[in-house]
Structure formats: structure tokens, C-alpha cells
Amino acid sequence: MRGLQFLLVPAFCLSAFLSAPAQSCSGMSLGREASLNGFIPFPSDNAWNQDISSAPVDPNSSAIINFIGDSTPLHPDFGAGEYAGQTMGIPYDVVSGSPFVTINFTAYGSESDPGPMPIPKNAPIEGYPNPGSGDRHVLVLDRDNCWLYELYSSYPQKNGSWDAASAAVWDLLNDEQRPYTWTSADAAGLSVFAGLARYDEVASGAIQHALRFTLQNSENAFTPPASHWAGNSTDPYAAPMGMRMRLQASYDISSFPPQAQTILAALKKYGMIMADNGSSMFITGDPDNRWNNNDLATLKSVPASAFEVVLIDPLYTPTNVPTGPAPVIGSFTANPSTVSAGEPVTLSWNVSGASYFVVSPQVGAVRGSSVTITPTKSATYTLYGTNAYGRSTATVKVTVQ
């Protein structure tokens, strides 16, 4: 994507064909760490939202936890205020009418979803107000269209575009599997936002999804819902990306303070999914000054030995990654293909086997089989159709006289 012309697309040009169904995201509040007001990303059968409290235990559970370290404490990697000049946690921003801008890829563009994306120039970067050189995640939820946009190693540019090592788009209304062996804005190929412990949920009394966590060591393998590995250990009991752990049902959480108790209840019902290499047993949440840090600190009394590993099945390694056909694009057309500046053009496509679509430039992630644009200059549009086995593309040129 580096070198593409920068585009700012007014929201009114896109709303007619990008708007999400009425039952979706419209109730979200706007802004940083905004409340989703009960909206739960992704369908109820999505891996993040599944009740795994009765799922079978992996036969190697004890050995895996012993490798992690039985006494390794759970650690909330989020909270109120700042530490060393940085906020604690991964921020997110809920936007409406935000201009779509170009994303320039600096590392993993071949495994990323192309722009444009509605990333505000002042979107909070992980670690703000002094994000430094860490992971620098940027998470943006588009309330108008119900898409989630996630960037890794993100740097805003003076012209309004963003540089990022990688990026992924997520349809908040549907299940989406990234292509096997592809990364995302997270090492495991997962959504970062999906696994955050958010203050708005805890304040409501329940977290209704699994949490994201990290371990110091991982094997060169992944298990669903992950799609990517980042192995740094050959130990047979190192965890694969996507491994899920849950707090044992017998573990007494009744004496924990309210915020910690709500988090621990979620870890019993939904568990936590390994998403990246990092400090062991660190769970991720959003930075919010309404967190009670003393309350959250009680989570550190919970040892890894209080958890169990949910059955790892299937397990994918470089020798058995699933293969299959990428989407088949039968046609991608522009009608009309020659217009005067500002006149509408309908881009239409006939595709089989795709999980989601992106049209670039100007449009971004889109549902359905057509989109109407109002180009101001001649451009070649690219359709990207993606599924679990790869991505297919097609192009069409629109001439503006």
C-alpha cells in the first residue's frame, strides 16, 4: 500500500452502501473507551463468545501449566492512570462519520487488509500520551457500519494517512476467519478488541466473552480461533497460539472485590485465549480512569495452578495447515465506467466463497455485492475477496472526464 495516493472520503459518499443493519452497532456511545451499551461483537457462536465452562480439559493441561509455572500469577495489564508516562491497557475509539484514509504498510502488508479505513488522525495509540516504540495498537470501531479496524505498530502521518506494520478489519456482525497462517494486528491472527476486559462491561456486571492473554513462550503452532503462530520455544509443552485456559469451577471467587470478581467469573465461563508472546498470564483490558487499581491488583493472588487448559483440538503446525480454494471472482464491473466528476458509479461483483470484501481506494470494507461511489478523478479500483484459504483480487478502471 505504500505509495498510494492519499484519499479522504467524506462519510456521506459511503453511507448509502456501507451502513450496517439497524439491529447492530447504532446504540454504541462515541469516543475513547466508550460504552457499547450492551452490544456484543460477533455472533453468539463465535469462539470469543462461547461458554466453555463444560468443555473437556486437555490431557496435557497439568504439564502445560507446569511449563508456564504453577505459581505464575494472573496479572491485569490495564488499569486507571499512567505508569511511566503511559496509560495502562489498549485503548479503543468508537467513531461516526470519520473520513476514510489510506493505510501504508511497513512490514506485513501481504497478510493485512488494505485500506482505506476510518482512522481519525488523533486516534489513541496504545501507551498514549507517550506510546514510545511498543506495540502501538490502534483500535477503531465504526458505529455507522459496524466494522472494527485494528492496526499494529501505528504511526500517524501529516497528510492524515497512517503507517502500520499490519492491519485487519473485522465484521462485527459475522464470524470471520483470517486466512490460515496470516497474522492480524495480533500475533495469533485474532482480533485484539474482542479479548479486552472493558470497564463498560465490568460496570454492567458481566463480561460476556473470553479475554486475551499472553505467555512468554509459545510453540510454532496454532489452534482455532487463531490463524498464525509466532513460535519461540521447542518445548513440547509450550502453548500454541489460540490455546484457551479457564479458571477452575471450584476456585472460590466470593471474597474478591467487585471488579476482580466480574473478571474472574468471565474466566470461569469463557476463559482466556492466548494471543501473543509476552509476559506470562497477563490479561489485557482498556485504559480507563474508572478502574479501581486496588481492586484489580487482587487478581495477582490467582496462580496459574488455579487454571486448566481447555482441549486443544485441532492443532495446526507447518505440516498440516488446512488448504482449500480462495474466493472465485466471476466478475467485477463499473457502471458506467466513464463519468463526469461527481457522477455516481456502481461497482458490482459476483464472487463465490468469500468471507468478507474490501474495495480500494475510497471504499474500504463492505458487505453485499455492489457499492456506489462518486469519483472526482480517474482511478483503478481493486476488489479484495478473502476467506480462510487466501485472497483473490480483481480490478476495474473508472475514467472521469
PLM features: what roles do these ranges have?
Residues 343-347:
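Structural beta-strand segments of beta-rich domains
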Residues 350-356:
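Short proline/glycine-enriched turn/loop motifs at strand-loop junctions of beta-rich domains
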Residues 18-22:
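Sec/Tat signal peptide C-region and signal peptidase I cleavage site
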Residues 7-16:
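Bacterial N-terminal signal peptides
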Residues 392-400:
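C-terminal edge beta-strand
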Residues 334-339:
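Short beta-strand segments of immunoglobulin-like
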Residues 23-324:
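Short, surface-exposed polybasic-aromatic patches that bind anionic ligands, especially phosphate groups
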Residues 364, 369-382, 388:
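Solvent-exposed segments in extracellular or luminal domains encompassing
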